[in-house]
Amino acid sequence: MVNVIMKISSLKKGSNFSINIKNIKLDKKLLVAIIFLVLSILGGGAYLYYENEKTKKLEQARLQKIQKENSDKQTYLSDFKSAFEGLDYQALTGFYDVLRSDIDFFRVNNWLLDVMDCNVNCNLAFKRGSFDTFTYLEMNRNGAVIKPQFDQNKLQFANVDYISGFRSIYLKDLTEQERDKSENIIEQCSTKLSELYNLQLLMKEQVKFKINLPRNVTSISGYDWVKNSDIKFGSIEIENMPEKNLGLMKNIMNNSMMITSISLQNSSFKSKLNYYCY
């Protein structure tokens, strides 16, 4: 507005020179504004391009992470199976506890580690802790303790400190009461398995023994394992049990178990039991 008034005033005085100067100054300002506008557009375009590339890189990193996790999972499961295959089991009850250091990792990643299969000279020996629950198991072969094997170069959680890290990252939002509740779920399911104590007598008879652990306990997605802690089902499969030991089944059965199938062949029988815990 000031420039316009100055132009009118200069016109009244008849100073064409003054008018031309004013017009030149006005054109420079307009040019600066146009340049600024162009730079703004270019800058905005560059920013959008940068954000788009950044989004692409993040998505690529996410997909690579998923691919690596899937690869790690298959590697671990393969090594896990090979580590347990053909072992002479000295005990069953600590199966949870051998994996207890991994359980949070499994929960977070929703991995399926829920089957224990023993086909060679199975011998169950339960080690009980306080309140009739077990707290410990060691699996021995040739006198040495066996634990699941995995490639420490491929799996990030091979570090001994990973457990506290995962707990602090993934379980930090859980209240103390919820954490206690989650532990109780595992303890209760584990206690149900400890009812199989009497099977240790049968395992000396080359009985094949397979336990399908409760899937919703050993394989959990997010925090649903805390919120949806309803009944968890598992199953136990027994083969080659001598007919003479059939009476021992009554020591296995309790209110939380039911036989779903049973068959007899060559003086031995095969059966499947379902069990559950709350």
Swiss-Prot record:
Its main location: membrane. The chain crosses the membrane at residues 30-50. GO terms for cellular component: plasma membrane. This is Toxin coregulated pilus biosynthesis protein D. Keywords: Cell membrane, Membrane, Transmembrane, Transmembrane helix. The gene is tcpD. It comes from Vibrio cholerae serotype O1 (strain ATCC 39315 / El Tor Inaba N16961). It is a single-pass membrane protein. The keyword Lipid biosynthesis does not apply. It comes from the Bacteria. The lineage of its organism: Bacteria, Pseudomonadati, Pseudomonadota, Gammaproteobacteria, Vibrionales. Involved in TCP pilus biogenesis. It is found in: Cell membrane.
